[in-house]
């Protein structure tokens, strides 16, 4: 989206779509950071007046038509991914700026139409990959692009957590993560890793993947994915392959990226907010950076950036196109898994 195409708007009213854990988080953050903004809610369940008041919500709606009549300046879609596009299109058509929780959708159907509509109407369309606002991940990216370890030769990305422990106050079987029709599964739920991999190393050119449901968890989606990603490589003209492993089954929560380079190795630990450097000269790991921020920090920065982008008319840090590129990779992964072959992505690019 061109910077000049975005119209400037003062954000007075925001609509939150969905009142799950992430919807509640967004409401609390907006209420704390922007108390002057009026918050409305659109949900498929009946509005409970006491519950709504407890979250500081002024208005609650049960239909898109009612929510459109509220005339919000912006909307944050925190409903299941399989419903994102059907909700987003009418709001974009009405001139409402959009922040859509990751993934932007559970497939690419309608995503290009949404991107085009937002561009035509001069709207911000932002995908909510909040890891882009992690101080440690930004520092990690900067160190790589500044040549700390020279040319990257190999990249190993891992993320996983035991699904029943993810939201301990909920029955995991009833969560979005566990249900295919809501857009669950490890590929969509842990798509942060696909996004930041492209943000750091360049776009994915091809994939080779194995996707499994191998645990005894009561889910109807994949719980494990092993990916090989051939990157366009933003560092040089050599082939760079990323191995990416994500799962719902490990009991030791993990989020890390290990890059092997010509001048050493660099390791990002997203759980600890740390970066370590292995130098061939010292033959040991050295902590270069450590900043364990509060969990809400990246979400707060994301909301600040969304509202700032609307009010300044500048393009967002994580665009609708970024969201589409992630879903395109996921669709190629699924195709590779079924066919047992390498799949190229050029035909899916924006």
State the predicted function of each range:
Residues 100-101, 125-127, 268:
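Hydrophobic residues in well-ordered beta-strands that form the structural core
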Residues 113-131, 151-155:
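Rossmann-fold dehydrogenase core element
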Residues 1-55:
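N-terminal Rossmann-like dinucleotide-binding module
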Residues 55-117:
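Beta-loop-alpha module in the N-terminal Rossmann-like domain of NAD(P)-dependent dehydrogenases
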Residues 47, 291-304:
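Active-site loop of classical SDR/Rossmann-like NAD(P)-dependent oxidoreductases
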Residues 134-218, 340:
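Predominantly a Rossmann-like dinucleotide-binding segment in NAD(P)-dependent oxidoreductases
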Residues 1-7, 41, 74-77, 232, ...:
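C-terminal helix-rich "cap/oligomerization" subdomain common to oxidoreductases
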């Amino acid at each position: 989206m061109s910077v000049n195409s975005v119209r400037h708007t003062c954000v007075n009213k925001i609509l939150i779509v969905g009142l799950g854990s992430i919807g509640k988080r967004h409401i609390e953050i907006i209420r704390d950071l922007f108390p002057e903004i009026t918050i409305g809610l659109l949900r498929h369940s009946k509005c409970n007046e006491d519950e709504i008041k407890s979250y500081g919500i002024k208005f609650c709606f049960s239909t898109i038509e009612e929510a459109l009549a509220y005339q919000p300046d912006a909307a944050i879609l925190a409903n299941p991914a399989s419903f994102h596009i059907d909700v987003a299109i009418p709001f974009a058509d009405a001139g409402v700026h959009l922040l859509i929780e990751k993934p932007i959708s559970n497939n690419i159907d309608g995503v290009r139409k949404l991107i085009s509509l937002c561009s035509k109407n001069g709207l911000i369309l932002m995908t909510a990959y909040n890891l882009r606002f992690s101080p440690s991940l930004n520092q990690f990216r900067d160190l790589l692009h500044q040549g700390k370890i020279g040319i990257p030769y190999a990249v190993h990305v891992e993320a996983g957590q035991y699904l029943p422990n993810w939201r301990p106050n909920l029955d995991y079987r009833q969560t979005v993560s566990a249900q295919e029709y809501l857009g669950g599964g490890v590929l969509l739920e842990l798509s942060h890793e696909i996004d930041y991999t492209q943000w750091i190393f360049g776009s994915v050119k091809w994939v080779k993947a194995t996707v499994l449901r191998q645990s005894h968890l009561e889910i109807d989606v994949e719980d494990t994915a092993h990916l090989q990603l051939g990157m366009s490589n933003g560092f040089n003209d050599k082939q760079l392959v990323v191995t990416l492993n994500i799962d719902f089954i490990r009991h030791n929560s993990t989020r890390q990226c290990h890059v092997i380079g010509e001048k050493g190795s660099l390791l990002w630990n997203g759980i600890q907010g740390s970066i370590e450097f292995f130098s061939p000269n010292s033959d040991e790991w050295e902590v270069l950076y450590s900043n364990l921020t509060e969990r809400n920090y990246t979400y707060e920065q994301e909301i600040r950036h969304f509202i700032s982008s609307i009010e300044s008319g500048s393009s967002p840090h994580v665009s609708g196109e970024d969201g589409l590129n992630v879903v395109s990779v996921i669709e190629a992964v699924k195709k590779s898994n079924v066919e047992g072959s390498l799949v190229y992505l050029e035909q899916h690019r924006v």
